[in-house]
């Protein structure tokens, strides 16, 4: 029997394992991951130039280090953030609900700082972007405020996609000295009896007929966004208490570096938050990649979504970023993950299984984009196999209205942001909308079953997911 089983080798699961080792090397720990070892994680697009829909899982979204860590590698120093409100720090897309509920700000800062140092110890970039231009940043924040936007700033430690691979290879090698790791292994079920979780049922991702029961004293759900839909199903099957949270639906936006040069120089990533008329939904920019590349990722072997990469050595002439709208559903419909999957499925149909790309001006003028128009467009697409089309067929009036009005508002701060040749790729959706109810120890209503990271709706992003893993380990080390 294991002391701890961790389901998922993304940032939260990896950091749980790492910190448990620091606290007690004698604990018997098993880390289960449906994807590959990081040594086998390579996207074929790098050589072929197109997505081949890897089976049994996508190499971008699954495998050691998870989806967010493998795609770009930005560590947001939220403990040093500036929201414009004295004494308040920003804690990501869901504003750190768990942390704000249970911990004071100094404790939050300490755990983020500690987590950041772990990454530094394994070779993360020591330089922090966004610390050198205080006056210029304040001027941008002032312009944003005049346009009805909030510009949140925080230093960023940019590792880069290729360097992230090297860093997590070191972490994987370290963990293998002390714990067991099962790669290419799915957790098909949780073993729960009389309100107590006693273990897991696992199968090979290549042969689901071979089942194995593994017992443990404590089971940690660290399934990430890739596992959010799986976790929602398990919550339903086993009466694990959870509630629908917000789902973020939007697009990946691509525009020239020249337009973003000041923002890229001063901040590296600008986090604009808007509540534009008429709906006043929360809209935010996310995951900005200067001189980056638009990319695809496949979730649940079923839906193709947009993302973005930025490398330390390989550069384009474009900046890309996500523009995401937070939607909440209650009565009578309360299945945000299902809604998001349907949006993605419909847009994927329009793109024949690929992302759809449309010029911003064409969307405003009520027309689709054609291939020949992209060939002569001033903004050259960095994602070559996206299909020219019309995203308005699938994204929905409310979502598109929020996105369009946010782009126009940002254009007042960053002239050229609403240029008609800028490109919109769809869909980009973040699946962390099933919020699992937990206590301060991350424990669910099922005894000895814990939930951390993005998959359970607790966090959004690499650093906060990692910090939840550190905190989880500290709690378990005393049990």
List where the protein language model places each region.
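Residues forming the flavin
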Residues: 1-88, 133-479
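Dinucleotide-binding Rossmann-like beta1-alpha1 core, especially the glycine-rich loop
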Residues: 62-129
